[in-house]
Structures are given as structure tokens and as C-alpha cells.
């Protein structure tokens, strides 16, 4: 029988690779003693049987395909399943909303949906302001925020144009008035901020 001290000594002389463990019987790693011991429980037997069935099916289906392509194939299937789908209630709500829109609103919505700020220019602008490099994720987030901001300003400018009884090609005066109206709402920061001394 091996004492704890002898086992430590043998472990120091012959280090085991990570992930391998000693078996309870004779110190042979569990991963390597498949022929020496019988399976301990039926779960491991079922798992190995399932694995064998899966690998046999893969070998029969595509024997000439390299293993990396098989892995990529299964990864893409998993990603497709995880993609969130729109439920029926949400789809009904969207169709109701689209049917209520006028042609002008629908075309404006489509243009707004397709538009985007160039990420490279946003990143360059942010880098010139901060003096540090900007990650791609930060540039993408800032481009999204800028798109929302422009949408709010344009929507407010259209409201101003309608209130003044003018037709929709927006003019600079409409945009200026929209920005002036958005400042008190807290959407725009105050650019003329003066530090109060006392």
C-alpha cells in the first residue's frame, strides 16, 4: 500500500499532465486506464456510446472533410439557434405601425434605418478630442448614439416646420430652433457653461 508521502514523491518524479487524475486503485490516470477498469457508472457508459454514435454519423456523412470544417459546421448551427426571433405579438405591432405610416414617413423611416455614421471617421474624431486611441466597440457605440441624436433633432425640426406652417424641406432655421428647444429638455448639453465662482 502506498502512503501519502510515497505518492507525493512519485508525483514529483513523474509529473502528470494537467487534467489527468489518479484512479483510486493503483495510481494509473483515469483517462488512460480504459482497458484496465470497468466503467464506474452507467452515465459515463451512455455518454461514450452517444459520442461513438455521433462520430460514426459524421464519418459516414463526410469522410473527406477535415475536422476543423466539421467544428465550424456545428458552431454555425448553434449560433443560428441562439438568434432571437420576433414573436407574433411584436410582428403584429410592427405591421400595425407600418400600416398607420404615410408614404413620406415610411420612406423617411427606411432611409433612417439604412443610414449610419462611418465608424472610422467617428473613431478619428474621438481620438482627436481625447488624445487617446479608441476601440472599435466604442466607435460603434458612439456612432449609434450620434444617429439617435440626429434623429431627435430632425424630428424636432420637422415639428417646428409644421408648427410654423412651412413645407418639409428643412432649413437651417428649423434646425436651430429644434436645438434651442431641446436644450431645456436636457437632451443637449449646455455649451456655454460658466463656472460659478461663489
UniProtKB/Swiss-Prot annotation:
GO terms for molecular function: protein heterodimerization activity. GO terms for cellular component: transcription factor TFIID complex. Residues 1-90 are annotated as: Disordered. It comes from the Eukaryota. GO terms for biological process: RNA polymerase II preinitiation complex assembly. Disulfide bonds: none annotated. InterPro entries: Histone-fold (IPR009072), TAF11-like (IPR045127), TAFII28_dom (IPR006809). Expressed in fetal brain and testis. Residues 1-10, 37-50, 72-90 have a biased composition (Basic and acidic residues). Belongs to the TAF11 family. PANTHER family: TATA-BOX BINDING PROTEIN ASSOCIATED FACTOR 11 LIKE PROTEIN 2-RELATED (PTHR13218:SF15), TRANSCRIPTION INITIATION FACTOR TFIID SUBUNIT 11-RELATED (PTHR13218). This is TATA-box-binding protein-associated factor 11-like protein 11.
Amino acid at each position: 500500500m502506498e502512503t501519502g508521502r510515497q505518492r507525493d514523491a512519485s508525483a514529483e518524479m513523474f509529473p502528470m499532465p494537467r487534467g489527468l487524475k489518479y484512479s483510486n486503485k493503483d495510481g494509473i490516470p483515469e483517462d488512460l486506464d480504459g482497458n484496465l477498469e470497468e466503467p464506474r457508472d452507467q452515465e459515463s457508459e451512455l455518454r461514450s456510446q452517444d459520442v461513438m454514435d455521433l462520430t460514426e454519423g459524421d464519418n459516414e456523412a463526410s469522410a473527406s472533410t477535415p475536422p476543423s470544417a466539421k467544428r465550424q459546421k456545428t458552431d454555425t448551427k448553434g449560433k443560428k439557434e441562439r438568434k432571437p426571433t420576433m414573436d407574433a405579438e411584436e410582428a403584429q405591432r410592427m405591421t400595425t405601425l407600418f400600416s398607420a405610416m404615410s408614404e413620406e414617413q415610411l420612406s423617411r423611416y427606411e432611409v433612417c434605418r439604412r443610414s449610419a455614421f462611418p465608424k472610422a471617421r467617428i473613431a478619428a474624431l474621438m481620438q482627436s478630442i481625447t488624445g487617446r486611441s479608441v476601440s472599435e466597440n466604442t466607435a460603434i457605440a458612439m456612432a449609434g448614439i450620434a444617429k439617435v441624436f440626429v434623429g431627435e433633432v430632425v424630428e424636432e425640426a420637422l415639428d417646428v416646420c409644421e408648427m410654423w406652417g412651412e413645407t418639409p424641406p428643412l432649413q437651417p432655421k428649423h434646425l436651430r430652433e429644434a436645438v434651442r428647444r431641446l436644450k431645456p429638455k436636457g437632451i443637449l448639453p449646455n455649451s456655454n457653461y460658466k463656472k460659478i465662482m461663489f
